[in-house]
C-alpha cells in the first residue's frame, strides 16, 4: 500500500558515501549505485538497518541514512559474515573489510602497483598491457598495437 507524501519530504537525489543516489528507486537498488555495494549486499544492509526494501530511497529519514552509512562502513559490527565482504584477509594488515566508493578503485590500483613492483607474472602482464587471466592472444586482442613495416629501397 503506497502512502502519499508531500513533495517537500521527498528527496530526488541523496548523497551517501560520496555518491549521488536516485531517490525514486527502491532503497536496495538505489544503494547499488555505490561502488562496492551490489544487490545482495544492499538487501542485507537494509535488513540489518530495519528498513523496508519496498520503500523509496527519497523517503528515508536522516537517521535511517546514517544507520545505512554506519553499516556500510562497519559491516562486522552488525554481524555480516566475513565471506560476504569484498576484501578478505588483506595483504597489508590481514583484516577483513568491505571496500566502498573510492576505496575500491584506490585499493585495486595499489594492488596492481604492488604486483608490478614485486615483478610477479600478473604484474608483468599488466605492465606490458597484455591479457592477465590466461586468455589466448595469438589472434584476439590486436587492436591498439601496431607493427611498423619498413619499405625497401628500389623499383
From Swiss-Prot:
The keyword Chaperone is assigned to this record: no
Q: Where is the composition biased (Basic residues)?
A: 135-145
Instruction: State the organism of origin.
Output: Entamoeba histolytica (strain ATCC 30459 / HM-1:IMSS / ABRM)
Which keywords does this chain's UniProt record carry? Cytoplasm, Ribonucleoprotein, Ribosomal protein, RNA-binding, rRNA-binding
Q: In its UniProt entry, what is this protein called? A: Small ribosomal subunit protein uS13
GO BP field: translation
This chain's function reads: Component of the small ribosomal subunit. The ribosome is a large ribonucleoprotein complex responsible for the synthesis of proteins in the cell.
InterPro entries per the record? Rbsml_uS13_C (IPR027437), Ribosomal_uS13 (IPR001892), Ribosomal_uS13-like_H2TH (IPR010979), Ribosomal_uS13_CS (IPR018269)
State its location(s). Cytoplasm
A molecular function (GO) term = structural constituent of ribosome
Q: Which Pfam families match?
A: Ribosomal_S13
Residue spans with biased composition (Low complexity)? 146-155
Database matches in PANTHER family: 30S RIBOSOMAL PROTEIN S13/40S RIBOSOMAL PROTEIN S18, SMALL RIBOSOMAL SUBUNIT PROTEIN US13
What is the gene name? RPS18
Quote the cellular component terms of the Gene Ontology held in the record. cytosol; small ribosomal subunit
Segments for region (Disordered): 135-155
Is the keyword Oxidoreductase in the record?
A: no
Its assembly, as annotated, is: Component of the small ribosomal subunit.
Give the family, as the similarity comment puts it.
Belongs to the universal ribosomal protein uS13 family.
Amino acid at each position: 500500500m503506497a502512502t502519499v507524501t508531500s513533495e517537500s519530504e521527498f528527496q530526488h537525489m541523496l548523497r551517501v558515501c560520496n555518491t549521488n543516489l536516485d531517490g525514486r528507486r527502491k532503497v536496495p537498488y538505489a544503494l547499488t549505485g555505490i561502488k562496492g555495494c551490489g544487490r545482495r549486499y544492499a538487501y542485507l544492509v537494509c535488513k540489518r538497518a530495519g528498513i523496508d526494501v519496498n520503500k523509496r530511497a527519497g523517503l528515508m529519514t536522516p537517521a535511517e541514512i546514517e544507520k545505512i552509512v554506519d553499516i556500510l562502513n562497519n559491516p562486522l559490527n552488525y554481524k555480516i559474515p566475513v565471506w560476504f565482504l569484498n576484501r578478505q584477509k588483506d595483504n597489508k594488515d590481514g583484516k577483513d573489510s568491505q571496500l566502498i566508493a573510492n576505496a575500491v578503485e584506490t585499493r585495486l590500483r595499489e594492488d596492481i602497483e604492488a604486483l608490478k613492483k614485486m615483478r610477479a607474472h600478473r604484474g608483468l602482464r599488466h605492465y606490458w598491457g597484455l591479457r592477465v587471466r590466461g586468455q589466448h592472444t595469438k589472434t584476439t586482442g590486436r587492436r591498439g598495437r601496431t607493427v611498423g613495416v619498413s619499405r625497401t629501397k628500389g623499383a
